[in-house]
Design a protein with these regions (language model features):
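An acidic, Gly/Ser/Thr/Pro-rich helix-cap/linker signature
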Residues: 21-108
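Acidic, Ser/Thr/Pro/Gly-enriched interdomain connector segments
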Residues: 293-306, 314-359, 395
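Acidic helix-start/capping segments at beta-turn-to-alpha-helix junctions
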Residues: 47-70, 119-123, 133-136, 234-239, ...
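N-terminal signal peptide c-region/cleavage motif recognized by signal peptidases
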Residues: 15-17
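Acidic/His-rich structured neighborhood in mature extracellular/periplasmic domains
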Residues: 76-221, 231-232
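Flexible, glycine-rich surface segments
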Residues: 169, 176-181, 186-301, 309, ...
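Short acidic, glycine/serine/threonine-rich helix-capping segments at coil-helix boundaries
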Residues: 335-340, 348-392
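Sec-exported extracytoplasmic/periplasmic mature domains
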Residues: 31-47, 52-59, 106-109, 120-124, ...
Length: 396
């Protein structure tokens, strides 16, 4: 009877996406994970040595379940991440690591200023790696149950890293979501792409900048980085540009974009290279516009955020000596989740299909805003600016 009760309890625990996690249910979960680890081929000694000491981390649960109270604009995101301080520090790191970076460029085809940009955005050039024990974070997220299968796999991958001797468990710390080291790799990415470039017998992404930068280069090469291409560039859009041509579903050759009137910010013609690109306008028609090349999508293989990809590309440009954007991104009104939900409801009621009314300003909501703008003779850029929000009735 006791065994049957335990099995029923475990089934209910793992099948419920949002059950509160307490010490008792966490202990039951760890008991199940021990057997699952054995079934996955992990040695009993490794499981016992490390799972016996894992602890429930309530902060991790809180962070995983929390949602931002307000929307965050591209201007906020970009300004924080591509700051003058980060640019200057990136240039210093590029100079001090130049010999290594040139070697990595020859080996992997990734220009050094891009590697330094990833390094800067992920951990401020190794300055802050996160201080949450990785096993505690991954075990907590596994047992919380919302994405249990994914985090169970990452927990077992972390145990394999410890089994290989790349890091001591006391040093295996990182973000609340389990990202680790100077490049903030998840364990699965670590196992596939971490490199022992300094030759000390360990893939040490915590203490060795050389290993970390080489690992980033290996990952980007595997994602399909094109050696001779840049990430993209800022461009100037002509008056009357059709913003329905933006986005990755509308890739065109540079020659085609030039025919449509696109130029460099100073008015010079676009390069004549044989490549395709998409137009990205993260802050609407009053903000900067970018052509995104193949390597832009490679950057999104590291982090799926378009804003992140632009930040990496522009930080790399600035580290290499480029100037600031010709057009600074404008601030968008800060909306709370209730306001975004109301916006989605109004757009849906008017037939513009914003999708689920969840209070999150995602791509579906942006497309619905563009449809509203087009129907009301506004510039249909999908940007939630003050004018459109006032006309819809979200702002006074």
């Amino acid at each position: 009877m006791a065994t049957r009760f335990l099995l029923i309890s475990l089934f209910l625990f793992f099948s419920h996406p949002a059950l509160a996690l307490d010490q008792e249910s966490f202990a039951m979960c760890i008991s199940k994970l021990r057997q699952a680890g054995l079934d996955a081929g992990l040695p009993a000694q490794v499981i016992s040595q490390h799972l016996d000491d894992v602890k429930l981390n309530e902060k991790v649960v809180e962070l995983d379940r929390s949602q931002p109270e307000f929307t965050s604009s591209f201007a906020d995101y970009f300004t924080r991440r591509v700051s003058e301080q980060r640019i200057e520090k990136g240039r210093e790191k590029y100079r001090s690591h130049r010999q290594l970076l040139d070697t990595l460029t020859r080996e992997y085809g990734i220009p050094g200023h891009y590697l330094v940009a990833f390094w800067g955005l992920e951990t401020n050039y190794g300055g802050y790696l996160g201080n949450i024990p990785t096993l505690d974070a991954l075990a907590t997220l596994t047992c919380e149950g919302r994405r249990g299968d994914y985090f169970q796999g990452e927990l077992f991958n972390a145990l394999r890293i410890l089994q290989a001797g790349d890091v001591d468990v006391s040093q295996m710390k990182g973000s609340w979501a389990g990202a680790m080291g100077q490049t903030q790799f998840m364990p699965a990415v670590f196992l596939k792409h971490a490199q022992d470039h300094d030759g000390d017998g360990r893939r040490d992404l915590w203490g060795s900048s050389e290993d970390a930068l080489a690992s980033g280069a290996h990952f980007l090469q595997a994602l399909g980085w094109e050696r001779e291409e840049r990430w993209g560039r800022e461009v100037h859009l002509p008056e009357g540009f059709d913003y329905q041509l933006t986005g990755f579903s509308n890739k065109r050759s540079l020659a085609d974009w030039a025919e449509l009137g696109l130029t460099l910010p100073n008015g010079s013609p676009l390069p004549s290279a044989e490549m395709e690109a998409a137009v990205i306008v993260p802050a609407g028609h009053q903000g900067p516009a970018f052509l995104a090349y193949h390597n832009f999508r490679v950057i999104m293989g590291w982090n799926r955020s378009e804003s992140y990809a632009i930040a990496v590309g522009r930080l790399a440009d600035r580290i290499a000596g480029a100037g600031a954007l010709s057009q600074a991104p404008p601030q968008a009104p800060r909306l709370d989740r209730e306001q975004v939900t109301r916006l989605q409801r109004i757009l849906n009621e008017q037939g513009h299909d914003a999708g689920k009314e969840d209070g999150l300003m995602g791509p579906g909501t942006r497309k619905a805003i563009a449809r509203y703008q087009q129907a009301n003779d506004l510039v249909a850029d999908g940007f939630p600016g003050e004018e459109v929000l006032t006309r819809i009735g979200i702002l006074p």
